[in-house]
């Protein structure tokens, strides 16, 4: 493997290892929030995602590209924002209502929310919970800070309501 003919292979192995560490760091930092929500292919899909993100690091030489540098590109951040931990329960399919999300203010809200109409629910479900969280994650230092708003529980009925959740953003 030290032969110059294997230089590209060494670069690929290095970047694959870095992507695997980044994906594990994200999964571990999300902890219990995704433990029961993920699907059996989440790890594979995260690896694919981080491979795409890593390619957006145009500063570092091949073999040394970093997720942290790539995330300075808004396109890379958009990839992460659109990732669903469970492909069979994507937010856009489960929540059939537009919502307001302001990541810089730490707020999430839904106006005129009618749970029985606006949520795809399992048969027999009578109640649901909305959990809103924000994760600060430093891929270079492996430091993470997960903050969570108080969960909101509600009946799956036809009574319109306003959902408004806010949290203090993490430092990391």
Where are the model-predicted features located?
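Long, polar/Ser/Thr-enriched low-complexity segments
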Residues: 1-87
